[in-house]
Amino acid sequence: LMTNGDPSDGWDNVNYIDKVFGTGLTQKHNVTVQGGSEKTRYFASFGYLGQKGNIDNFNYSRYNVRANIDSEIARNFKFSLGLSGVLSNRHTPAFNSGGTDANSYVGEAGWLSIANQTIQMHPYLPEKYDGLYTASIKKNTTLPQSPLAAIYESGYKKTRGVSLSVNAAISYELPWVKGLVLKLSGSFDWGSSYNKNLNTPYNLMSYSSGEWKKTADPRGNGDGNNLGEGSSYWQQLVGQASVSYVNSFGKNNLDLLALLEVRDARSNNLSAYVKE
């Protein structure tokens, strides 16, 4: 029955490890431009990282840019400007790919992970029976294990992140006092993240004690969808004014610095949850 090629009888011969785990793909691209003259130097870098997991529906992408310029804009005046930014996107099913249960905050990540459900799945069960994904019952529990349903029917987790950093500085070396430098500098950092988690309950056909039985997914979500959304942002502004003096007198070195710093940091978090 397991080899007759007809899974409708409730028997099959499926390698669930091969069904779940495929070949992942990682690609990374970078473009760099740099150059300048005797008094000005510039640098720019653009990068992309894309990852497709060896389990379906696990994807990650990241774009990053970095640029800076250093210039002597006038005699004894120096100026620098830097910019960096990152944009990232992550998409996964509602179940984790693997992990342990050590952190109670994230729930039973290892116990119900797709990897754990895969090794619990019986190869003689067809992928679907009576129109539903099949499941085996984890030993000493009542939890149905169905890795394919966990991948394709459990919902999703989406996370998008954006960060930006800008810094600038200007300095002036006083020509009539050797080693005395006045400097103004500032930086601005900003970041935000957005996440959306959708849990969609699903039914399974589990096989236990010689009979098929319709069961709910192991999360026990009931009949309604659960949707959670959240966003957060943070920003920090730093300004500095300094006077430095560096000089040598014979075998003695003198290094003095007076610095004033102003800092302002803010953040905000917002989340919402709804159940159908």
Describe each region flagged by the PLM.
Residues 1-12, 53-60, 64, 68-163, ...:
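Surface-exposed loop/interface segments of Gram-negative outer-membrane beta-barrel transport/assembly proteins
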Residues 1-56, 94-97:
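Residues embedded in well-ordered regular secondary structure
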Residues 26, 37-38, 72-74, 173-177, ...:
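Outer-membrane beta-barrel channels and translocator barrels
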Residues 28, 163-165:
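Intrinsic-disorder/low-complexity, polar/charged segments enriched in Ser/Thr/Lys/Arg/Asp/Glu/Gln
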Residues 32-34, 45, 68, 167-171, ...:
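Outer-membrane beta-barrel architecture
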Residues 39-41, 163, 179-180:
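Secondary-structure boundary/capping motif
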Residues 44, 138-142, 168:
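Generic structural signal marking isolated hydrophobic packing positions
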Residues 166-183:
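Short, charged helix-to-loop "capping" segments that act as catalytic/coupling loops
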